[in-house]
Every structure is written in C-alpha cells, then in structure tokens.
C-alpha cells in the first residue's frame, strides 16, 4: 500500500555528528564479535559507550550499519596471501579494529599528557596560593573560574538543545511504517447491521485535513475500554447506566451500510472508501446507553505527538435521522495552578491532548490487554460475523468497536504490540494482521526502541479546540482532572485503571498538584492491576526503557466524562483515578505497591564505561533489554555492582575510561584511599593508577620511575613468595569468609590476605615497600585481633609475622645497601625520581616515607620494647638481619607490642645462648705479652687481601664513615645479649685475634685487667666492642695500634663508660659476619674508623667532649661540602634577606653549628641534629615554595638525613652485636631516635 513506501530512507536521516575514535572502536569491536549482519546485537552491546550528550538514536541499528559502512570504505581490504596451514588470515574487521586501537592509544597518550600538564599547573598555582603570593588576585581568579564554568555550561546547553532539535526533526520527518495495523472489532447487540463487523472512525474531511496535515498519521477510535498511557487512562463505556432518556443523538456522519462491509474491513479500506461508505456501529452502555468512542490522532509534525480524543456518541438502532447540524459548546476551565485552556470541541467532540509516542504506545498496549481480558472473561453476546476467509475470529474487544491506526517511528508501537500480543496471548487474529515480515520488523523495532532516552519528548498540557463547526448540536462535556506527583516508576507490567462512577459534573479542570515546567516524558500511571501482567517481556522491557528515560514524575488523571442530551439530561461522570504501581512515597497516591526490585530495574539497562572496561573485555557481558525469568536471581547483585558506576557515568567523558580502577572492592583490598596516608606522601606526583596505564606516560622522569617500579615489583614478589611458602601461610592465602569465621567482617573492617596483596601488587595499588609492609602487618593484625590469645591461629599469626618481618627487614637492608653502593652519596632519591623534582609540603619535614632508610630508622625506636619489657631478646636469625625494620606506624591499629612476639621463642635456644658466654671470658682476658708478635703476624697474613680491597674503595665512601659514638647517642642502645649464642660459631683464628686485641687493650689501660669479677665470674668492666677486633686486624704496625688506642681512649669515654661497668666482656669478634660475609658498609666502616676506635675505659668528661668533637667534625665537613651548602655556610644578613630576623626567630647556619660544637654548646648527637634541622627549617619557612633556596634546602636536608640514617643503622648494628647488657649509652637521649 501507499503508506509503506519510503521505508528505507531512514539511512539518510540519522545523526550527522562525527563519531569519536572511542565509539568507532566500540562499534568495530562489537561487529568483529557479533558479525556485520547482527545489528541488533551490535547496537545493544555498544549503547552504554555513547559519549555524553549523544541523541537517543545515536547507536540505532541503521546508524551503526551506516557508520560501519563508512569505516569499510575508508579501510583497504588486506590482500590475501598464500600462507602455510594454520596461518590466520587477517580480515577487514581485524584491520579496522587494529587501526582504531592504535588511534585510541595515541589519543589516550595525548589525554594523559594533557592531564599531567594540567595537574602540574594546578599544583603550582595551589602552592602559590598557599604561600600567599596570589592573595591580591584571589577574587579575580574566583571570578574567572566562575565565568569559565558558566560559559562551559552555556555551551553544553546550546549543544544539547541543538542535538535535541535535530533529533526531534529526524523524528518528525520519518516515513510511515510499511503497513497500518487494524484491530478487528465486532458490533454489540444493538448494532444496526447485525452480522457485520465495522470499525468506528470519524473520518470527515475537516478532521483529516487538520489532523493529518503533512504526514500520514494514525487515528484510534475507541468504543469501549481503556485509554492507557503511562499516565492517561480513560475507561469509557461498558458500565455506564442509561442516561436519562437512554439514547444519545448520533452525529450527522451516520451513513447506510455498505454491502462490501459485511466482512472485517481494514483501515486502508476505510481510507479508500471515505467517511460515507460505512455506517457507524452502535454501542451501548451496559445494555441501553450507547458508548462514546475515543479517538487519538497524534500528528508527528510537531515536536511531540498529539493524541486527539474524540467523543462520538453512538445512535441507537432505530434512529436513522439525516444529518443534523451541530453546535459547539465550550465548557468552563478551572485551573488552580497551571492555567491550560481546555475547550470541548464540536462534533465529533475532538479534544487534542499533547503526548509523546511512548504514552501512545502504552495506551494501545493496555487497551488490547484489558479488552482481551474482558473479552475472555465475559461470553460474547451478539451476532458473530465470519471474517473474510470465513473463519470466526476472537477479537481483542468482544463488546467494543475498535479501529486502530498509528504512525510511530520506523515501525509503530501498535504493530509491535499487536504482533507480540498475538504471539504471546495466542489471539487468533486475521491473517492480514500478521505476517513474517511484520514479526521480524517488530523484533527489530523492539531492539531499536529500547533505549531509555528514545522518546524524551516533554508532556504538554494545552488542550486546544480542534475545529469549529457552524452548525450547533448539544455536545457532551468532558471533565479532566489532573494531579501531578513525583515518584519513581520501576517496572511497567501493564498498568490499567478501574472505572469509578462519580457525581455529575459540568466543568473541565486541570489541577496540577505540583506546578512544574515542561517535564520531559513525564510518566502518568493510572490504575492498579495484579502483578501478573499479560504484557509480554519484550513489551515490558520497551515500556520500562521509555519510563527510565523520562523524568520520574507521575500524574493522577481523573477524567470525568459527562455526556448529556440537552439541558434536561443529567450528566453522568466517568471518573478515572490513576494510581502508580510503585512510588517513591506512598503518600503521593492511592494504593502504592512496593516493588522489591526497584533498585534492580533502575540499573538493569545501563552500564557505565568504567565498569565495562575494567572487566578485561569490552563486550564481555551483554545487557539484556528485557527482564527475563532469572531477573530476581541475579538482578540484585547486578544492581549493586552498577549503582556506583552509574552515578559516576554522567559527564565523565574520557575520564571514565581512564579510571581503570582494579576490580578489587574496598572490602577486598582492605584499605581505602583516605586511610592510606602513605600514598598521599610518597605518591604525590602524577602517578597513574595502574602500571598498565602508566606505559602511556611520556615524561622522562616517569619512564625512569616505571623502570624502577618494574624492578621493585620483581624484588618484592620474592618477599611475597617467601611469605606464601611459610609453613603457616595456608591460613592467610585466601580471604576469610563468614562461613569459616562467623562474624569476622563485623570485627575486622579491613580484611587482608596474601592473594589480595599479590593482586594489589600486580594492579599497582601497592607501589612501595612501605605499602607492602603495611598490608602484611594489617593481615596479621586482623588475625591477632579476631582470634583469642589461646587460639592456634593467633600463635600462627604471631610466629609467621615475626618470620615475614625478618624477610622484609632483609629486603630493606639489601635495597639500602644496593642503592648506597651504586650511587654513593648521590643526589638521586631512593624512589628513582630525579633529585630536582619539586617536593610536596609533606616532604618538607621528613625523609620520603617510602625510602628504606626511613623505614629502617623508624623501626629502631621499637627496639626498646624488647629491652624495657624484659622479654626474650632477638635470636640469631634476627641478628643476621641487616637492621631493625619499621613497625607500621601509619595506622594505630597496626601498632603491635613487639615484646609480645617473643612469647613463642624456644627456651632451649635461650639456654644455649646464655651458656656460651660464661665459658670463655676468663681465657679471653689472659694477657700473654710474649705471644703478641706471633699473633700479630698471623693477623696481618689473614687480613692482607681485605686491606688491598679497602684501599681501593675507602676514598669513595669516606664521607659515610663516622664513629660509633653517633649511633650510640642518636640511635638505639646496644643490646647486651646480641652476641650470645654466636661464640660457638666463631672460628679459632678470630678468637685468637680478639684475644690479642684484649691484651692490647689491657696494656693501654691497666684498669681493665685489674677490675674484679662479678658473681658469675664476669668482669665488671667490659673490653672494647667486638668491632674493635676487626678494626685492630687492619693495623699494619703495632705503634699505630697503640697510638690509636690512646686516641680512642679519649674519644669514646662518654659513650661506653656508663654501660661497661656491668657488662661482661665481648671476648670474640664473632658477630655472625666473617670476612667473606662482611657487607661493604661494614668493611668501610671498619677501615674508616680504624684510626680512631680503641678500648674505652677512662671516665673523663673533657676527653669525652674532645672525642665527641672529633667524631662530629667529619660529619660537619661532609655537610659543608654538599653541592647546595653555599647558602647555609654563613649567617643570613639583613641585606641578603630583608625581614629575615622578623620571620626567623632562631637563625642557624653551618658556621654557627661548628662554633657551638667547638665551644661545647652541642654535647650530644640529638642537639647536633636539632640545630641542623633548624637550619633547614628556617630556609623552608622564610623562602617561597618556588624559590631556588627552598628547593635546595629540602633536597639537601633529605640527602643529609639519608646518609646519617645509613650510618646510624650500621653503626648501631655493629655496636649492638658487640655490646653487652646495660643502661642506655646516653641517659639524656635514652637511646630514642631523634630523626
């Protein structure tokens, strides 16, 4: 027929905006996956990936096909090559995807670079603002930002309006469908032509001219049943009582019956024959009163379709009067809030109501559903006429005369609803109504029109006069009462309304309860029906998408239709109340129904970009358009997973793709960003959120950091594997479930396990040793916190924690040694960043928290827990570690009492350690002067190779060498028992070497040999530390040894006098490091201090101070020789820095520091470090953050602290392995770390 022409012109009426590379890549990937013939699947899969602001039909099937054809035209087909068997030939789809992937990668690189530049610019501006340099421009900056934001919003609004206008224009010019569906109906008892079925329709020329101007449109004549939309539902006829006289005059368009109309005519025949060829069938209200048909005429010429409600009073059977002139009666309009003129129009009493096609489709669908139920429920009464082919048909309306015609989009909703209703409800319709092509088109139409924003046309409420007729006739009056309410529609399951008889009324009212402006696609839901809807799943999905795309607002429409005859006929009102099936608030309407799947249906049909992209495959999971039977099973979990990404999906643009958050929830990885303070300190630079995204970085410093990160990841995985191979690791390998540990997640708020730690390392969430150690400690802390102290898992956690921390300590020490030995006193940060990078405000007062030096130095503060709590001391395996590690102090919940860890120590090992020192102290102190020369010769021979090596490298590392006095005061005290248990392992040659050293010490200070022994036979005064044994082994001449003993006697009096009186001698140099195993720093330390260290036995304060000065002068020289030391050498003058003394109350410089050291004002390492930090802090406080002196101070402070920490750690280790039990070396400092 004529209405089916031009159906393929839609290919040229799609959106004209260019596609982004991302959208093209999504399209190409979906085509490669689903094929270039299955556009339904392709369109459905890529709908979530539309850019913000795209029109609803952007990813329509025809638009996708058109765009892909353009891609094919611009892509060269790969030439076929004869390859070997099994060789994969690249197809054109592969070429397109590969090409677009490369373009997308380049685009992302550019985006990342721009983001990094913008970040640096914003960071620089923020620092200037914080420093107070832009206080005068703050208002101007705020105004600029507000203006820019306003302009952006205006541009976005203009673009959005242009897009909407273009979309509405496309909707208006779309051609009609291939055919117009007709629902066949039957005449009731009082039909004028018994045995014939006729459709009702007021098809006067005036109506056709006005209602169908420009475009073929559908019209719908409803004799009885529901006028169902998402919000407008009118139930007319069927239950109205007889109106006073029992008859209503028919309009003049009544004509005689046509012989050809004995069958079931279609709407096309009506259009061809004209309005005078068919008689208007008669309907009755119950049995007597005639039914007023309702006609909907939506002209798609406007931005929104308009439905025309035509009230056509039917004439009884005996009445065959000629045409009677009609008069037009205008009813009063009562509008409390929003005044919308409403007029009752002339015959056939047409009232135009503006609505979009989504509501029209709902009207049509619900009419069929209700009519079908009513037809099935009540036995058909009246004559049944056979159809054209002679078969009796079951109409959708047994008691009504219905003719339906509607022009939708590509294929109208009525056709879809008709076909689906026939398929699902097994309605035996006429063969004309259903064919294979229509079914295929309907399924395609469902796929294409399921977009939530497919029909965003706003509801409008002007009810205008359709046409004027000069001939008057008493016309029925219509009362429409509208109330608006706000609610959220969750799932439309065929909502209908119940007819309610109300008192007569003669006014037309529109009463919006909540006056609002134009509301886009407002839902108006009427009636309450049982949950078991007859609407098929496809239609429900389609309706739901339309509702989700519209604003969550509903209306209760009360239509009081009053039909009267003259003035003496009372008006009978049909008042229809609409009640939402499920609302946000029950108080907004009557009989609200709570829907438990509310959250599910809101998110069922949307998928955010970030969630899809982090799943590994873009199209790994499809979104089902129609809620299926398994909706209740997996819907809740899917809704939960989609809820958060949906909120973030609006306006993110490319950022939603760049987020790439690993699929590890907060409950899985055990910590959130606001708790991970380490990240804010150590990862302040623009570090990508994952290693995968970091490969697109183009900055040179980022490339260096990436390489360092790869190396670190390989190294830390060795530590992880050591922990995973622990004998108790099976308890900590997988996350703990509530089945295994009831109530675990109510006690442990941040669960952690080894598999999560590994996943976080691979994903880039853990990027430093500090973060790794934090999560390891968190894992054990959770086990200790949940389990009771007598539980097996508690003890397993404690023991495994100790062993794993030993591994981490070894890793940190090795990392520190490698960095120190590779770079020496390098300016490069231990994080692999360039030394000239800007420091954060958090780095002003401390060394980078991720550096091994910082971790090791912080851990030393906890060593006192062992000493003060009188618990068991570390065993031999702990002493073999290079240093004391950090106890995670970033989170208070991780701060364990280290003394508790030692409760599981083996007591037999302790007895073995305690028994060995008592066997040999006496023989170690035997002074045999005659054997001194032979022992010295043996010592020289054994250390000849070591001296050769030291002579080559001592010069490079000399600035690191300071005396052990520094560590005794600045770090932690010696542990007297740290050498216990090691003497058994010492070699015989080393014992002789140490014995010779003791004799030399006894010679230099006779007091050592004369001290009486204590209760256990141990001397009350200890000999030199064990490190002296190695130092003395480096001497080449006995005179040098004596000279150094003398100088050392002066140097170290202050340090060891207070603790030597009650300590047993360390008779051996057995500190678990023989010559082959001695680390580089140990040997350097030994060589550098060989000219200073010797036995200390004199308690002379003057000599102690001289020793302290001699010890710190090399440190001061090291600092003064730094490349950035020039601004700090001399006091700052007022000429150089105006107002300096007003800002800095306690000036400090290197010259003043040296003077205070010489005059005795600085007597401890703590005071030295205090003044040193004061000097740097003054520079940071006075200068701006962008000043070069500021950066010099920050960087120099960092490097000096790192070097001092390295020395303190190793000196403490060496001293701790040789010292014995006693009081802290410096009562003032109490051994606590001072930095």
Swiss-Prot record:
GO terms of molecular function: nuclear thyroid hormone receptor binding; transcription coactivator activity
Gene Ontology annotations for the cellular component aspect, listed alphabetically: mitochondrion; NuA4 histone acetyltransferase complex; nucleoplasm; nucleosome; nucleus; Swr1 complex
Modification Phosphoserine, positions: 383, 387, 579, 621, 637, 641
Domain Bromo: 706-811, 1099-1207
Stretches with biased composition (Basic and acidic residues): 831-846, 979-999
Cross-link (Glycyl lysine isopeptide (Lys-Gly) (interchain with G-Cter in SUMO1)): 481
UniProt superkingdom: Eukaryota
Region of interest (Disordered), ranges: 186-205, 551-597, 621-672, 827-848, 903-940, 966-999
Coiled coil: 97-171
Main localization, broad class: nucleus
InterPro entries: Brd8_Bromo_dom, Bromodomain, Bromodomain-like_sf
Tissue specificity comment: Expressed in adipose tissue, brain, heart, kidney, liver, lung, pancreas, placenta and skeletal muscle.
Pfam families per the UniProt record, alphabetical: Bromodomain
Cross-link (Glycyl lysine isopeptide (Lys-Gly) (interchain with G-Cter in SUMO2)): 469, 481, 509, 575, 612
Cellular localisation: Nucleus
Keyword field: Acetylation, Bromodomain, Chromatin regulator, Coiled coil, Growth regulation, Isopeptide bond, Nucleus, Phosphoprotein, Repeat, Transcription, Transcription regulation, Ubl conjugation
Described purpose of this protein according to its UniProt entry: May act as a coactivator during transcriptional activation by hormone-activated nuclear receptors (NR). Isoform 2 stimulates transcriptional activation by AR/DHTR, ESR1/NR3A1, RXRA/NR2B1 and THRB/ERBA2. At least isoform 1 and isoform 2 are components of the NuA4 histone acetyltransferase (HAT) complex which is involved in transcriptional activation of select genes principally by acetylation of nucleosomal histones H4 and H2A.
Protein name as it appears in the record: Bromodomain-containing protein 8
Upper lineage: Eukaryota, Metazoa, Chordata, Craniata, Vertebrata
Gene transcribed to yield this protein: BRD8
């Amino acid at each position: 027929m004529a209405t089916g022409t031009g159906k393929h012109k839609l290919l040229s009426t799609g959106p004209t905006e260019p596609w982004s590379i991302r959208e093209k890549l999504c399209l190409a990937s979906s085509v490669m996956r689903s094929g270039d013939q299955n556009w339904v699947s392709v369109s459905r899969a890529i709908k979530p990936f539309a850019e913000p602001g795209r029109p609803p039909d952007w990813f329509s099937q025809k638009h996708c096909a058109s765009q892909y054809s353009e891609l094919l035209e611009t892509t060269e087909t790969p030439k076929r090559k004869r390859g070997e068997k099994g060789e994969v030939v690249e197809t054109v789809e592969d070429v397109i995807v590969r090409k677009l992937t490369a373009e997308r990668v380049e685009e992302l690189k550019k985006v990342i670079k721009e983001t990094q530049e913008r970040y640096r610019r914003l960071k620089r501006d923020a620092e200037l603002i914080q420093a107070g340099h832009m206080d005068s421009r703050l208002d101007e900056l705020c105004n600029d930002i507000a203006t820019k934001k306003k302009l952006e919003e205006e541009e976005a609004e203009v673009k959005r309006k242009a897009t909407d206008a273009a979309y509405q224009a496309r909707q208006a010019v779309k051609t009609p469908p291939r055919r117009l569906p007709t629902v066949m109906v039957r005449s009731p008892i009082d039909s004028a032509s018994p045995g014939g079925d006729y459709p009702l329709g007021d098809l006067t020329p005036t109506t056709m001219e006005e209602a169908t101007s420009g475009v073929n449109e559908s019209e719908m004549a409803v004799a009885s049943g529901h006028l169902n939309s998402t919000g407008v539902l009118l139930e007319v006829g069927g239950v109205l009582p007889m109106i006073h006289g029992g008859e209503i005059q028919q309009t003049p368009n009544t004509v005689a019956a046509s012989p050809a109309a004995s069958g079931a005519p279609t709407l096309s025949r009506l259009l061809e024959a004209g309005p005078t060829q068919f008689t208007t069938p008669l309907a009755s209200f119950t049995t007597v009163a005639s039914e007023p048909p309702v006609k909907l005429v939506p002209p798609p010429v406007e931005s929104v379709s308009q439905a025309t409600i035509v009230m056509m009073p039917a004439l009884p059977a005996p009445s065959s009067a000629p045409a009677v002139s009609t008069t037009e009666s205008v009813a009063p309009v009562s509008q409390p809030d929003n005044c919308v003129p409403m007029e009752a129009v002339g015959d056939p009493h047409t009232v135009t109501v503006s609505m979009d096609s989504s509501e029209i489709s709902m009207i049509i669908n619900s009419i069929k559903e209700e009519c079908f139920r009513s037809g099935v429920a009540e036995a058909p009464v009246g004559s049944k006429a056979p159809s054209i082919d002679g078969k009796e048909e079951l109409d959708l309306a047994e008691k009504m005369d219905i003719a339906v015609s509607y022009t939708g989009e590509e294929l109208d909703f009525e056709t879809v609803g008709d076909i689906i209703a026939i398929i699902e409800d097994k309605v035996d319709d006429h063969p004309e109504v259903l064919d294979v092509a229509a079914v295929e088109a309907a399924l395609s139409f469902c796929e294409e029109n399921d977009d939530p924003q497919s029909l965003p046309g706003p509801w409008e409420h002007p009810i205008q006069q359709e046409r004027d007729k000069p001939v008057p006739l008493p016309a029925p009056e219509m009362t429409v009462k509208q109330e608006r309410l706000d609610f959220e529609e969750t799932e439309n399951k065929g909502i209908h309304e119940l007819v309610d008889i109300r008192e007569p009324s003669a006014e037309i009212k529109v009463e919006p309860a909540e006056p609002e402006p134009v509301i886009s696609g407002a839902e108006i839901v009427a009636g309450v029906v049982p949950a078991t809807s007859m609407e098929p799943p496809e239609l429900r999905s389609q309706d739901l998408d339309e509702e989700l795309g519209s604003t969550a607002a509903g209306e209760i429409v009360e239509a009081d239709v009053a039909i009267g005859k003259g003035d003496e006929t009372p008006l009978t009102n049909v008042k229809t109340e609409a009640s939402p099936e499920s609302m946000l608030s029950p108080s907004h309407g009557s009989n609200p129904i709570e829907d438990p799947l509310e959250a599910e249906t809101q998110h069922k049909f949307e998928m955010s970009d970030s969630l899809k992209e982090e799943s590994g495959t873009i199209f790994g999971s499809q979104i089902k358009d129609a809620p299926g039977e398994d909706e209740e099973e997996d819907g809740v979990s899917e809704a939960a997973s989609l809820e958060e990404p949906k909120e973030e999906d609006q306006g993110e643009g490319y950022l939603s793709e760049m987020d790439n958050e690993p699929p590890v929830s907060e409950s899985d990885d055990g910590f959130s960003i606001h708790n991970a303070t380490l990240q804010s300190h150590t990862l302040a630079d623009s570090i990508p959120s994952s290693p995968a995204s970091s490969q697109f970085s183009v900055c040179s410093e980022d490339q260096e950091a990436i390489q360092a990160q790869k190396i670190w990841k390989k190294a830390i995985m060795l530590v992880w594997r050591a922990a995973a191979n622990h004998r108790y690791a099976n308890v900590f390998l997988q996350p703990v479930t509530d089945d295994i540990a009831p109530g675990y997640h109510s006690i442990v708020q941040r669960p952690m396990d080894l598999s999560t730690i590994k996943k976080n390392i691979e994903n880039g969430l853990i990027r430093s040793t500090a973060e790794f150690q934090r999560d390891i400690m968190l894992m054990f802390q959770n086990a200790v916190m949940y389990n009771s102290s007598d539980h097996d898992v508690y003890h397993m956690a404690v023991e495994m924690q100790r062993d794993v921390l030993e591994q981490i300590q070894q890793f940190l020490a090795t990392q520190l040694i490698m960095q120190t030995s590779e770079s020496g006193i390098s300016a490069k940060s231990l994080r692999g960043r360039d030394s000239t990078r800007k420091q954060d405000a958090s780095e002003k007062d401390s060394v980078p928290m991720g550096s091994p030096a910082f971790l090791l130095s912080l851990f030393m503060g906890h060593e006192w827990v062992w000493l003060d709590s009188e618990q068991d001391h570390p065993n031999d395996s702990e002493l073999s570690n290079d240093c004391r590690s950090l106890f995670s102090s970033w989170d208070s919940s991780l701060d364990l009492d280290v003394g508790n860890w030692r409760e599981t120590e083996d007591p037999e090992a302790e007895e073995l350690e305690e028994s060995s020192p008592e066997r040999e102290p006496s023989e170690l102190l035997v002074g045999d002067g005659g054997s001194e020369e032979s022992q010295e010769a043996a010592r020289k021979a054994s250390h000849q190779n070591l001296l050769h090596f030291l002579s080559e490298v001592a010069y490079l590392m000399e600035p690191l060498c300071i005396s052990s006095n520094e560590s005794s005061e600045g770090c932690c005290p010696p542990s007297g028992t740290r050498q216990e248990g090691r003497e058994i392992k010492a070699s015989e040659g080393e014992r002789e070497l140490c014995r010779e050293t003791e004799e030399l010490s006894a010679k230099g200070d006779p007091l050592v040999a004369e001290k009486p022994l204590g209760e256990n036979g141990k001397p009350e005064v200890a000999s030199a530390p064990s490190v002296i044994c190695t130092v003395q082994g480096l001497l080449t001449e006995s005179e040098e040894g004596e000279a150094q003993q003398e100088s050392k006697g002066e140097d170290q009096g202050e340090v060891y006098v207070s603790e030597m009186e009650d300590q047993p001698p360390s008779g051996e140099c057995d500190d678990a490091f023989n010559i082959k195993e001695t680390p580089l720093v140990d040997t350097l330390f030994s060589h550098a201090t060989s000219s200073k260290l010797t036995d200390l036995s004199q308690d002379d304060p003057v000599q102690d101070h001289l020793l302290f000065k001699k010890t710190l002068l090399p440190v001061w020289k090291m600092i003064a020789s730094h490349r950035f030391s020039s601004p700090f050498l001399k006091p700052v003058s007022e000429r150089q820095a105006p107002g300096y003394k007003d800002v800095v109350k306690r000036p400090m410089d290197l010259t003043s520091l040296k003077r205070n050291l010489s005059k005795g004002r600085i007597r401890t390492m703590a005071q030295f470090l205090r003044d040193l930090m004061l000097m740097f802090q003054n520079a940071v406080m006075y200068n701006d953050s962008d000043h070069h002196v500021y950066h010099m101070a920050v960087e120099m402070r960092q490097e000096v602290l790192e070097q001092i920490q390295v020395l303190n750690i190793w000196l403490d280790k060496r001293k701790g392995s040789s010292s014995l039990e006693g009081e802290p070396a410096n009562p003032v400092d109490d051994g606590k770390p001072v930095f």
